[in-house]
Amino acid sequence: FVHFSFMDRTMTTVSIAFVNSLFRVATVAVLFPFIRFLEKMVCAIFKEVVDEEDKDIVEISVLDDRFIAHPTVAIEQAKTVLCSMAHMAQKNLIRSMELLDTFSQEKYDKIQRREDKVDRYEDKLGTYLVKITQQELTSGQNKEVSKLLHTISDFERISDHAVNISQAAAELFNEKLRFSDCAVEDVIMKEIVGNVIDAFEQNKVEYAYKTEPLEELVDIYCDEMKMNHVKRVQKGECTLHQGFIFNDLLTDFERIADHCSNVAVAIIELELNVFDTHEYLINLKKDNGTNFDKYFEEYKEMFPLSQY
């Protein structure tokens, strides 16, 4: 034990502060050369899983109840989180489609984790938006909150169907089966989901108008692919079990397109102050200034079934 002369003295506040500062400076001086080593040691002990999913965790924290008294801020925060949720659903879909081509257990597990996160976002957003509706809102704010409330479940359901696709991919992998027929649906699914997210995120009604023609094309192609697959089963080229899996996949594709259509219709209806969805869809397909036929033919040429 080292004895210093000042230890026999009565310590004042000044001397305590001085010794404390001296100790800290000495500690830094001694440990400074070992900073890199200490950093590596801490990282080795507390391993951090670096994943892009972690970026999303921060975003849900912006739904602070203190903002609810200020609807403009609260609505903007809610939209930010919902856009983040939509992108998570989109990434889940992209990953699940990739699994149909090349299965990866790591990617499969990531899809399941992301789906859990999407569910948490949906619950938190729904509760938060209901609280916002209890405030005095302007007409514009009411419209924006309505759009968010209308679209939450559709984005969540897109992620649900992505999980279904991943599970079908796992089943195909385990049974050493593979489908080549899904190539066209792969590109169309990415197109329709990306299109509707852009429409929602950027408030682009013109993007929303392109969604319904794409949804129509998805339905037509799925029907054709089902018929073609039935013929292969009848010829003995595919098993009945393969047929069930394939039909389930096509159903998921159709449902995803339906949910994209729901989001697009919500955007357009709220923009035009039209709230009869059935009547709107009828008028849309009559091409009353919406360029439905034009977009449909463009997409049909862009994604020809015979090329896949």
Task: For each feature predicted by the language model, list its residue ranges.
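Cytosolic, long alpha-helical scaffolding segments
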Residues: 2-19, 23-308
